[in-house]
């Protein structure tokens, strides 16, 4: 009955009657709903069921191969980017390339037959969106490739995506404007009137068919049954009852944490209620896909471009890329309001931005954003989030996450993000308790399992629970192929700190000798694993970091002539790892005091040698600890007197850098942190000086280990200062 598209056929495309077009439009909406359901299964930690659903759809006659290929590509993209494993990335790239090609063919076909499946946009628009989405995701995977040729191709793909997204976004704006004019004038367009079926005296409106039906179609029972089926699929998806769970409203909480989960009412709601007033129940599936897809892709693209270092950003601007972080964030936030995979990916991106391990919005740099007057902007009614809210979304982000937790109760991915949010709020013990509430061995997605264990280990070192952190991190050797060298080094650093705490009498344990032995073995053998079990054959930034550190430790041992290799290690390296993962912003006062004690009171031959470079690392970390403890001026004085003079000075009004390579990450980081000290001491009056420090941090070096991580943080801070000046 619904054999309309004839995918794979080489014959000329015939003209379709309205009845044939109506059937094709409903089939398209059905297949998109099926694909959205399949992707939601993955987000509920059931990738097998999602892929089986796509296999079932592919086997059916005249199914929409384009959306199925994209859905499969999105699933594989999520798996690949969660784990950064070469085979997974290669597999996802091939699928996304197929989706790109199919999208172009489907768009051309829809344009030729005039298949208007949207009341707002011209035929083929939805396939322009599937093309840009598959192109963008494919380009991101290509950027991770070590091939220069692939990286160059990725830039071209990004450029194509960028321009097509701009084109579609303009089409959306024009369509919305036209729609508002019609509403204002009171005119009615038959082409945009939902189809009405009339059978047995009852009427049913199908929002998926954007025009009036013929009298024969209105009474067609098969068409009606199909339209009702699609309506039912959408209703269940919007309520979260489409992937084997009861409606999500039953699990919706108002607060984070385990206690709030225990306080949920026991009585079950069976009605298909939506979680938010933002969800438009009258929106057609295809229109929803277009809106959310464009907002997500264009938003993420702009945020990524805005975070790139100036040198790369300048090159991209020449070929037409320009990124506005504020506009990008606003678009991603719009995408999250849609109850589909685009909204979920958008939320994951926002969680990484606001509460991820690097936290581009540094808690200590809490500058209030300027409120810009947008009253004269023709799009002002669409700007639902102002500058201050975009900067500090607070409860809005929390509620969005809690909705996803309700929608996907079986997913460890969303539980992990709740734990990250708790950690970001300094509720470290609660974060660990939440991660402990799930049996890690039962997490189906291996990449999510790895992330859960890694994040728990990071949180445990912020709590100085090094024994368990080491056990967690070593367990990843059997689960993850990311960086066995870093896992081994990390665990060794944990055992080193435990041994030192035993030495200082801060910890009583009969395992002191075991800690010493494990620390020595793991730290110094970690470098033997470099280049092995990484998602690229060349070493990762953190791999290069540990190689340099271990070589430093070995050189100091030889220089001092000490027998115990651990006596050649000055500043405890676990505190560097804690800084890289934002630990100083998350520790309680109790744990900050313990960190300060470990940094300043432990003694060994390497520390007593007062090596200038090791003292710099120690003094930098102590200054940050003091700032978080509220001793801001004292911390700033340490930075000014003991850290900055070793590589930075101002002579005759000009900045002079002393280029050092001993600890490349520390020098621009110290300049960045100096900007935060100025802000904390002088407030808004100190913003011009803060910006000067940030520009100095940015200008210290173009490329160094961890430069991407540090550079993005600096760039985000500069944009924040600029927004408030």
Swiss-Prot record:
Residues annotated with Phosphoserine modification: 246, 377, 380
Localization: Cytoplasm; Nucleus
Residues with Phosphothreonine modification: 196
Keywords noted in UniProt: Cytoplasm, Nucleus, Phosphoprotein
Any one GO CC term of the record: nucleus
Principal location: cytoplasm
Name of a matching Pfam family: Iml2-TPR_39
InterPro entries, per the entry: Iml2/TPR_39, TPR-like_helical_dom_sf
Role: May be involved in mitochondrial DNA stability.
Stated family: Belongs to the IML2 family.
Name this protein carries in UniProt: IML2-like protein SCY_3392
Source organism per UniProt: Saccharomyces cerevisiae (strain YJM789) (Baker's yeast)
């Amino acid at each position: 009955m619904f054999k309309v598209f004839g995918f794979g056929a080489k014959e000329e495309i015939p003209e379709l009657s309205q009845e044939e077009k109506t059937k094709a439009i409903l089939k398209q909406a059905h297949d998109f709903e099926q694909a959205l359901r399949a992707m939601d299964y993955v987000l509920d930690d059931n990738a097998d069921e999602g892929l089986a659903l796509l296999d079932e759809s592919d086997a059916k006659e005249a199914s929409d191969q384009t959306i199925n290929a994209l859905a499969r590509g999105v699933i594989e993209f999520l798996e690949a980017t969660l784990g950064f494993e070469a085979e997974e990335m290669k597999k996802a790239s091939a699928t996304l390339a197929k989706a790109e090609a199919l999208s172009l063919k489907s768009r051309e076909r829809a344009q030729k037959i005039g298949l208007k499946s949207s009341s707002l946009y011209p035929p083929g628009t939805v396939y322009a969106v599937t093309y840009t989405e598959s192109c963008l995701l494919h380009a991101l995977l290509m950027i991770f490739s070590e091939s220069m040729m692939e990286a160059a191709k990725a830039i071209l793909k990004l450029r194509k995506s960028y321009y097509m997204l701009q084109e579609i976004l303009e089409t959306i704006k024009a369509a919305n404007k036209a729609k508002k004019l019609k509403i204002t004038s009171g005119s009615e367009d038959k082409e945009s009137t939902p189809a009405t079926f009339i059978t047995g005296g009852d009427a049913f409106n199908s929002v998926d068919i954007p025009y009036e039906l013929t009298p024969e179609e209105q009474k067609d029972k098969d068409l009606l049954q199909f339209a009702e089926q699609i309506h039912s699929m959408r209703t269940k998806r919007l309520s979260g009852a489409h992937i084997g769970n009861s409606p999500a409203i039953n699990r919706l909480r108002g607060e984070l944490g385990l206690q709030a989960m225990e306080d949920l009412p026991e009585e079950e709601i069976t009605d298909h209620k939506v979680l938010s007033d933002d969800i438009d129940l009258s929106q057609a599936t295809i229109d929803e896909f277009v809106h959310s897809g464009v907002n997500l892709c264009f938003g993420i693209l702009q945020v990524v471009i805005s975070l790139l270092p100036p040198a790369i950003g300048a090159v991209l601007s020449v070929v037409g890329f320009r990124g506005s972080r504020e506009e990008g964030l606003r678009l991603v936030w719009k995408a999250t309001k849609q109850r589909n995979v685009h909204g979920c990916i958008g939320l994951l991106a926002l969680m990484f931005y606001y509460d991820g391990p690097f936290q581009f919005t540094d808690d200590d740099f809490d500058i209030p954003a300027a409120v810009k007057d947008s009253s004269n902007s023709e799009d002002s009614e669409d700007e639902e989030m102002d500058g201050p809210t975009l900067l500090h979304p607070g409860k809005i982000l929390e509620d969005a996450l809690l909705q996803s937790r309700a929608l996907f109760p079986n997913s460890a991915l969303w539980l992990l993000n709740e734990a990250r949010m708790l950690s970001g709020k300094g509720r470290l013990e609660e974060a660990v308790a939440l991660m402990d509430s799930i049996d890690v061995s039962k997490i189906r997605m291996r990449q999510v399992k790895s992330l859960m264990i890694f994040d728990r280990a990071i949180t445990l070192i912020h709590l100085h629970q090094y024994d368990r952190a080491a056990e967690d991190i070593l367990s990843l050797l059997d689960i993850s192929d990311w960086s066995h060298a870093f896992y081994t080094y990390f665990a060794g650093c944990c055992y080193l700190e435990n041994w030192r705490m035993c030495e200082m009498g801060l910890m009583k344990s009969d395992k002191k000798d075991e800690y010493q032995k494990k620390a020595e073995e793991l730290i110094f053998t970690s470098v033997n694993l470099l280049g092995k079990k990484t998602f690229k054959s060349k070493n990762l930034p953190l791999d290069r970091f540990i190689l340099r550190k271990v070589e430093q430790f070995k050189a100091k041992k030889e220089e001092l002539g000490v027998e115990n290799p651990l006596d050649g290690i000055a500043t405890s390296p676990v505190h560097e790892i804690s800084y890289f993962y934002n630990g100083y912003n998350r520790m309680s006062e109790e744990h900050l005091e313990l960190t300060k004690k470990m940094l300043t009171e432990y003694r060994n031959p390497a520390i007593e040698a007062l090596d200038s470079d090791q003292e710099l690392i120690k003094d930098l970390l102590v200054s940050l600890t003091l700032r978080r403890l509220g001793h801001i001026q004292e911390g700033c004085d340490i930075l000014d007197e003991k850290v900055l003079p070793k590589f930075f000075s101002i002579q005759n009004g000009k900045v002079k850098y002393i280029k050092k390579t001993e600890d490349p990450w520390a020098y621009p980081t110290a300049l960045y942190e100096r900007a935060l000290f100025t802000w904390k001491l002088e407030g808004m009056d100190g913003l011009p000086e803060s910006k000067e420090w940030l520009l100095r941090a940015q200008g210290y070096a173009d490329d160094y280990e961890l430069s991407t991580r540090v550079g993005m943080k600096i760039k985000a801070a500069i944009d924040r200062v600029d927004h408030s000046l």
